[in-house]
Amino acid sequence: MKKLSRTISGVTPVAVMTKPLPCPGKCIYCPTFAATPQSYTPESPAVLRAKSCEYQAYKQVALRLRIIQDMGHPTDKVELIIMGGTFLSADITYQYGFIKDCYDALNGVVAGSLEEAKTINETAQHRCVGLCIETRPDICGKAEIQRMIDFGTTRVELGVQMLDDDIYKLVERGHRVSDVAEATCLLREYGLKVHYHWMPGLPGSSPEKDLALSRMVFEDPRFCPDGLKLYPTMVVEGTILEQWWKEGRYTPYPNGTMTGLIADIKALVPPYVRISRVLRDIPAVFISAGLKDSLRDGVRQILESRHQKCRCIRCREYGHRQRKGQTSGEPTLRRLDYPASGGKEIFLSFEDASDTLYGLLRLRIPCASLPVLGQKYGAKTGLVRELHVYGTELSLGEQGDQSAQHRGLGRKLLAEAECLARDEFGLDSLAILSGVGAREYYRSLGYELVAGYMCKHLD
């Protein structure tokens, strides 16, 4: 049966799980099970799929493609999501081999190297237009970022949890708030999208503190992530936190309190942010205390009762609103500027009068040049960190009356970004850290490949 929401945001997500690996963290809330990747539980859907494939990346990707195609979805534009503990702390040879196997599965042919696999994927039937990696803020330095660029990464999810050093110390997180700020800045300056994992309800916090920190994350320019995964704290079987709960040292928020808090957070999120999840996908049998059921309906009801709306990207996407039967109008170009990590972010979007979001572009005016681009593009270069047109995914070259894709909105957004970079900010070039499978699109618009980036001089 075709699940409409699977490709409704314009791409096909394919989750791939690494083999069980040791994690440098010792967080008291993190589940640890034998023969299961760190932070996951044995019966989670992604874990069960990975186990059936012996945690081999090639088998996992091939299986997911076959299942998604059998469900009637296009698989031309794929976003790979690498899951399973802290991948970047694993053996480096394993990392490169794992990513290569993902591309080989998309390509249907085994390449001689990762670079060859990426080149093949530029024109393959199943193109990787996005690649996401999860990591810790303290395992996100320049060396790790360069490795991610080698992989073709476009989005990084940081395990931030909550921006408070006292909480970090209490839960044995192993890093500081300053590490979050530094990692966020580096990721932005290299042109990557930055999402945070956000955990209200941790030991040492309170609903009031969680809300204040949630407000701060968007008011403090050191942070301002592009997206959030809201993961209310759960007491999971076998964790140190479960022992604290049994001893009375920790009590999770009542369900109503947590649902109200999530509604408060959603109400304050800026329109440039995408909230992709509001609860971790952990089977209820492994949850000793805390929320076990989806929050979306309860949160929506609270917001409606307050006459409030969540303005996040997911709630405003063309495809999601179309599925709900909402009428869409004619999109017009909008612009939102905000400071972040020492530079300037310009959020361009096509939206209608009801704020329905058809497409977006994130333009960064960086605070420093990128040496990896060399003399030709290194100085006075702006960064396009994301270009995305929403609506039900269409196959390459396909047209559809009910989709926002393939109407030229992406080209218009990019043309506007080029004009702004040149005329308003005096930049002479743009660089885009695009997915490998999107490179041909940018080549058609005059961009060339330089050190993993698609670059163009602005005449």
From Swiss-Prot:
InterPro entries: Acyl_CoA_acyltransferase, ELP3, ELP3-like, Elp3/MiaA/NifB-like_rSAM, Radical_SAM_C, rSAM. [4Fe-4S] cluster binds at residues 23, 27, 30. It catalyses: uridine(34) in tRNA + acetyl-CoA + S-adenosyl-L-methionine + H2O = 5-(carboxymethyl)uridine(34) in tRNA + 5'-deoxyadenosine + L-methionine + CoA + 2 H(+). Zn(2+) binds at residues 310, 312, 315. Its cofactor is [4Fe-4S] cluster. It comes from the Bacteria. GO terms for cellular component: cytoplasm. The keyword RNA-binding applies. SUPFAM superfamilies: Acyl-CoA N-acyltransferases (Nat), Radical SAM enzymes. Residues 6-271 form the Radical SAM core domain. Changing residue 6 to A: Abolished tRNA-binding. One of its GO terms (biological process) is tRNA acetylation. Acetyl-CoA binds at residues 77, 386-389, 409-411, 442. Changing residue 280 to A: Reduced tRNA-binding. Changing residue 73 to A: Slightly reduced tRNA-binding. Gene3D superfamilies: 3.40.630.30. Pathway: tRNA modification. Belongs to the ELP3 family. tRNA uridine(34) acetyltransferase, which mediates formation of carboxymethyluridine in the wobble base at position 34 in tRNAs. The proposed mechanism is the following: (i) recruits S-adenosyl-L-methionine and cleaves it to generate a 5'-deoxyadenosine radical (5'-dA) in the radical S-adenosyl-L-methionine (rSAM) region, (ii) hydrolyzes acetyl-CoA in the N-acetyltransferase domain and (iii) an acetyl radical is formed by the products of the two domains and (iv) is transferred onto the C5 position of uridine(34) in the bound tRNA molecule. This is tRNA uridine(34) acetyltransferase.
